[in-house]
Design a protein with these regions (language model features):
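Basic/aromatic-enriched alpha-helical hairpins
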Residues: 1-63
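Conserved catalytic core of the tyrosine transesterase superfamily
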Residues: 24, 111, 125-143
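Short, leucine-enriched amphipathic alpha-helices that occur as contiguous helical runs
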Residues: 27, 73, 117, 135-139
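N-terminal DNA-binding recognition helix of tyrosine site-specific recombinases/integrases
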Residues: 33-36, 46-47, 62-96, 149-151
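Flexible interdomain linker/hinge and immediately adjacent N-terminus
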Residues: 54-55, 90-125
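Conserved helix-loop functional segments at active or binding sites
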Residues: 62, 86, 122-130, 162, ...
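Alpha-helix N-cap/helix-start motif at helix boundaries, enriched for small hydrophobics
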Residues: 77, 141, 154-157
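Conserved tyrosine-mediated DNA breakage-rejoining catalytic core shared by Y-recombinases
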Residues: 158-200
């Protein structure tokens, strides 16, 4: 039988090379959680039985992981396991993940209230002029992500100069491949000009 950790690392690297950075990150996070639980990188697929899965689930809950985080790790592990079965390096077990949680739950409210958002947007520009440069940059990037209609950080980080045309930015989502166009408000344009790489050789 093959080694789960080695195979998971191989899959994550393949995802990264194909540009699926978000998914690759999830695979690596799941892999690290499994290593922490197992205590070593030596873990054969044969040992990943239903008892192991249930124990891993209990471990994640003891670490205060939400049920949605548990589900993400389990679904990732299931996807890796199924790939390994297809490659004949893991044993096929019907309904192998039946007894662990792989659903979704609304554990808690994640959106800010309107009042909180208004206060944040009012105070944030002021603080950008009052704090150390590292914190200024962090707050500025958060503000910019909001102004760009909630652009994910990975997409913001991979923006190129040619993505901007006048007062619009057109970019392709790293996660879905979908092409999106966002109109730049003056505040967003100021932040982009402040933090963009001015090196002529930089894309």
């Amino acid at each position: 039988m093959g080694n789960l950790i080695s195979f998971m690392k191989e899959v994550a690297e393949g995802l990264r090379k194909s540009g699926n950075y978000g998914t690759a990150h999830v695979y690596r996070s799941s892999m690290n959680a499994i290593i922490a639980f197992n205590g070593s990188r030596n873990l054969s697929f044969k040992k990943v039985n239903q008892e192991f899965l249930k124990s891993f689930e209990s471990y994640l809950r003891r670490k205060n992981c939400s049920w949605n985080t548990v589900s993400t790790y389990m679904r990732t592990l299931r996807a890796v396991y199924n790939r390994a079965v297809d490659r004949h390096i893991a044993p096929y077990v019907p309904h192998h993940f039946r007894y662990v949680y792989t659903g979704t739950r609304a554990d808690r409210k994640r959106a800010l209230d309107k009042e909180d958002m208004e206060r944040l947007m009012k105070e944030l520009p002021k603080r950008l002029c009052q704090e150390n440069k590292e914190l200024q940059r962090t707050r500025a990037l958060f503000f910019l992500m909001f102004l760009l209609r909630g652009i994910p950080f990975v997409d913001l980080a991979y923006l190129k100069k040619h993505d901007m045309d006048g007062n619009t930015i057109t970019y392709r989502r790293r996660k879905t491949g979908r092409l999106l166009t966002v109109t730049l408000v003056p505040e967003a344009m100021k932040l982009i000009k402040r933090y963009m790489n001015t090196d002529p050789a930089s894309p």
